[in-house]
């Protein structure tokens, strides 16, 4: 049986002075903490969505429901993937938040080890709350999915997700 991994985000930084830095968050897993930088400069709407859902606790207790070894680990189904509230193993991976879907913000961030990118359906403008973290290079996703962040520390904990 698959281990269920839960996530929790904590904010690390706030705006300092006039210079705007990309926000950093902590993704807490059962294996350890993962420090992530969010690229607000290239995917502002997607980063704002992640921050909003995080701030409101929507990701707390949400499982990594799809893991493809050597490719990626996917999480963020706040509707069906919350292990603390209404977890639905037959529906996990099909839900999103109650917020509207986001328009694509495709960019030049490469999908490589540690890249965070939004999951979506075949419709490029269907990203909502689900996202994935790449285990390795995935150039076939470049400019096809909205990359919005990068693991800075703790990728070894993502590698333990099975």
Spans of features found by a protein language model:
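Sec-dependent N-terminal signal peptides
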Residues: 4-13
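Cyclophilin-like peptidyl-prolyl cis-trans isomerases
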Residues: 12-162
């Amino acid at each position: 049986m698959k281990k269920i991994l839960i996530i929790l985000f904590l904010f690390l930084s706030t705006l300092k002075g006039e210079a705007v830095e990309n926000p950093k968050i902590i993704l807490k897993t059962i294996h350890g903490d993962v420090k992530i930088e969010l690229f607000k400069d290239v995917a502002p709407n997607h980063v704002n969505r992640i921050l909003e859902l995080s701030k409101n606790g929507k990701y707390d207790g949400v499982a990594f429901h799809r893991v493809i070894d050597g490719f990626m680990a996917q999480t963020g189904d706040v509707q069906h993937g919350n292990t603390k509230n209404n977890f639905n193993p037959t529906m996990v991976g099909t839900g999103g938040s109650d917020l509207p879907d986001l328009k694509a913000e495709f960019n030049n961030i490469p999908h490589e080890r540690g890249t965070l990118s939004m999951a979506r359906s075949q419709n490029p403008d269907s990203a909502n709350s689900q996202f994935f973290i790449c285990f390795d290079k995935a150039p076939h996703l470049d400019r096809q999915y909205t990359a919005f962040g990068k693991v800075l520390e703790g990728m070894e904990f993502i590698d333990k997700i099975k």
